[in-house]
Amino acid sequence: MSGARRDGVLVAKARAARLRAWAPYSGFRVGAAVRAGRRTFTGANVENASYGLTICAERAAVVAAVLAGARDLGAVAVASDTVPPTPPCGACLQTLAEFAGPGLPVTLSGGRGSRVETTLGELLPRAFRSLPPERRRG
């Protein structure tokens, strides 16, 4: 499968995950899909009345990947309905940086067909890292 087609599939999975979001307070629904090897893992934001306990879609997808034994992320897609598309928050970017390098492709998909292609390094140029890559394999 070509890179463009693979990224299209990743975006479609993120958009499908967005439909499963629980966002009764803000109405802001986000879905995410991460690729690790040949597998894809999805997540959606899950709000809580205590906003600080809300789980972001990107972190939910990363947690699903880690629970399945994945440690090296190859790409991520984030879907919202905003124009322009909404990037991951700082906590999500730092979580992605725990399992990927700055070259991680990040596709942001928004409303009215809007789309942004970027990298983790462009979104978080100075990620905090304390573990060397060989220790991150778990």
Question: Language-model segments: what does each one mean?
Answer:
Residues 37-48, 72-76:
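Glycine/charged-rich beta-loop-alpha catalytic/anionic-binding loops adjacent to active sites
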Residues 27-37:
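Short beta-strand scaffold segments in enzyme catalytic cores
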Residues 14-17, 57, 61:
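Stable alpha-helical structural segments in soluble proteins, enriched in small hydrophobic residues
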Residues 22-25:
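Short Gly/Pro-enriched turn/cap motifs at secondary-structure boundaries
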Residues 45-60:
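Compact, glycine-rich, soluble single-domain proteins
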Residues 64-69:
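Alpha-helix C-terminal capping segments
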Residues 2-20, 70-138:
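C-terminal binding/interaction regions
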Residues 36-39, 110-112:
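Short acidic-glycine loop/turn motifs at beta-strand connectors
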